[in-house]
Amino acid sequence: MPYRSMPKFDTGLVELGDGIYAYLQWDGGWGVSNAGFVDSDDDGLLVIDALMAPSMTQEFVRAMRTVSSLPFSKLINTHSHADHTNGNQFIEGAEIIAHQNCRNEMLDAEILAREAAVKSPPRGDKPAWIRDDWWEELAVVQPSLPAVTYGKSMSIQQGEHELTLEYRGEAHTTGDSLVLFADQNLFFSGDLCFFMPLLFAEEISRTG
C-alpha cells in the first residue's frame, strides 16, 4: 500500500464483537474521529467517545438507534480533545467516565479560554483546521465534564462484557484511556494510535 494511503470506507457502524460496535467516519482527517458503543440488554448502552460537531454526534446517535432503543448508561471519554468530547451533551443521560487527568485538562483555564474564543461572539477568525460547516455548530456546544474518574485502572461490567479502562502514562495527552475487552480480544485506543502518523503526542509536545 502506498505511503499515507488507506482503503476507502463508508461512515457507519462496524460490529467488532458480540454487541460491540465501532462507528467509523470517513475520511478520518483533522477532527473526524471514530467512536464506539456496547449494546447490553441489562445495562443499556455504553458509549466510547463523542464527536466533534453536534451534527456528527447526532448522526452517531441515529446510527446507534438502528441497533438499539435502550437508554444511554455510560459514556467513556478516552481523552480531553474536542473531537472526542464536544458531543458529550448529546449522549443524553449517560454517566461520563474518564481518567482524572482528562477531566483536569477539560477544566484547564487555558483550554476553556481557547474554547470560549472559538464559541462565543465575537468569534474572530476561524482556525484553519475547523471545517466551514462546523463553525456555526460549535457555538452551541456546552462543556459536559466527566462525573467519574479513575487513576490507574477501572473495571466496568456492562452486561456480559467486563471492560477495563487502563492508564499507561502520558502519551497523546496527559490522560489517555485504553478501553480493553479481554473476553473479545479487542480494545478502543482513542487517539493513542493513528493510521498516519502512528503517534501524535500533542499535549506532551507542548509541555516538553
Language-model region placement:
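Metallo-beta-lactamase
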Residues: 44-46, 50-54, 155, 162-208
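Short Pro/Gly-enriched beta-strand edge/turn motifs at strand-loop
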Residues: 16-22, 133-139, 159-165
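Conserved beta-strand hairpin/beta-sheet module of binuclear metal-dependent hydrolase folds
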Residues: 13-63, 177-191
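Short Gly/Pro-enriched turn/cap motifs at secondary-structure boundaries
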Residues: 26-28, 138-140, 145-147, 167-170
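Acidic/histidine-rich helix-loop elements
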Residues: 23-31, 108-118, 197-206
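Active-site HxH/HxHxD metal-binding segment of metal-dependent hydrolases
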Residues: 56-57, 62-148, 155
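Active-site environment of divalent metal-dependent phosphoester hydrolases
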Residues: 30-32, 54-55, 80-86, 103-107, ...
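Short acidic, Pro/Gly- and aromatic-enriched capping/linker segments at domain boundaries
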Residues: 2-14
